[in-house]
Amino acid sequence: MIDTSIPLVDLHRHLDGNVRVNTIWELGHQHGIALPADSLETLAPFVQIQGKETSLVAFLKKLDWMVGVLADLDAVKRVAYENVADAALSGLDYAELRFSPYYMAMNHKLPIEGVVEAVVDGVKAGLKDYNVKINLIGILSRSFGQAACTQELEGLLAHKQHLVAMDLAGDEMGFPGELFNEHFKRVRDADLAITAHAGEAAGSQSMWQAIQELGATRIGHGVNAIHDPKLMEYLAKHRIGIESCPTSNLHTSTVASYADHPFRTFMDAGVLINLNTDDPGVSAIDINHEYRIAKSELKLTDAELAQVQRNGVEMAFLSDSERKALYAAKV
């Protein structure tokens, strides 16, 4: 099912959406933070999906517990380290971990730039202990507004040498992409790649805006593109990658069922698309789960799954030499 001769990658993976349940428990007790449960076992339903949520916003509330225990920069560093470990232990050869320093900092008023530094330090420590390639993507959390995103952007750009790209995430309907055009002009000026959450809660126009105005070369989720034939044609022609996260889309009620997921429609249209976990800690999944689902529920053949793996390597924010090195390591 997973072709071991092809690098296995996860490109849409939120670092702050992958905090271990036991880490939430331990950090909560260490810092005297009131948790919603009185045991590790009963904590899980508050931080992980049980079935599916009614909306993206309800899903995101699970994430609040994950960042709610980040009481100091050591906690941030620990979570970053464990993200590297989890990526390696799930069999990934390469992962792009994205994170929102404003979101991670806000509960305990941590310095935004300090959060970025702690994430970088935690990832570096993890890479000394685990055999996996990791790159970082900074997130601007649109839900907190333009001013907050300016603070976030400045904290991230201060460490731009440790990033490969910037992302726009959060409440797509309430805070449309055009509010952040100036932010992403600065991202382009910094020579960072751009991806954006779009076409998840909003329609195809959100994707057009992300591509044409923000400068996105990849789109997170993008499920609503299928209702716009011109956009589908554009995506295929220009090799705009779709970072697909089927289980997350089910959990957020973006799609009603796996059978309703448009993954097959994208593939049949020749759109570059790959499989990702999104918030693996919240969804309680790993990349292997997504490939199993793609075969059993999305009805992809082994040959198609191998193409999806190759797509992921092509879509990755890597140089050609780095891509070749990933393949060479599989021989």
UniProtKB/Swiss-Prot annotation:
It comes from the Bacteria. SUPFAM superfamilies: Metallo-dependent hydrolases (SSF51556). GO terms for cellular component: cytosol. The active site is at residue 200. NCBIfam families: aden_deam, PRK09358.1-1. InterPro entries: A_deaminase, A_deaminase_dom, Ado/ade_deaminase, Metal_Hydrolase. Its cofactor is Zn(2+). Catalyzes the hydrolytic deamination of adenosine and 2-deoxyadenosine. Zn(2+) binds at residues 12, 14, 197, 278. Binds 1 zinc ion per subunit. It catalyses: adenosine + H2O + H(+) = inosine + NH4(+); 2'-deoxyadenosine + H2O + H(+) = 2'-deoxyinosine + NH4(+). Keywords: Hydrolase, Metal-binding, Nucleotide metabolism, Zinc. Its EC number is 3.5.4.4. This is Adenosine deaminase. Substrate binds at residues 14, 16, 170, 279. Belongs to the metallo-dependent hydrolases superfamily. Adenosine and AMP deaminases family. Adenosine deaminase subfamily. The keyword Cell division does not apply. It holds the Pfam family A_deaminase. GO terms for molecular function: 2'-deoxyadenosine deaminase activity; adenosine deaminase activity; zinc ion binding. It comes from Shewanella baltica (strain OS155 / ATCC BAA-1091). The gene is add. The record marks 221 as: Important for catalytic activity.
